[in-house]
Amino acid sequence: LKELLEFKADDSITLEIDKLVEGIEREYKFEESITRVSKTGSDLRIEIDFIYNEESNIKALDEMDRLREKIFNSLSHINYEKWLNISFTKDKNWAI
């Protein structure tokens, strides 16, 4: 039963992911980002929502996919099976 429940990931992992996302938020001039990290057994679920505006440096789908790949590669050293979902929206309501 314990393995079916989602638990908070280790603080060190959560902090590392938060710092990565904060840096990307600044680099691409996103208005805000929301990050959720949880653990189930050997799986790590990472959900990142970027809220962008007219000043954001990313618009095209290809650019979004390259950023997803950049984030995934930046997390490759974390020894969990990762499930990564990254969304982009102008409306924060879709991220909450």
Task: Give residue ranges: language-model regions.
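Alpha-helical transmembrane segments and adjacent TM-loop junctions that form the membrane-embedded core
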Residues: L1-I96
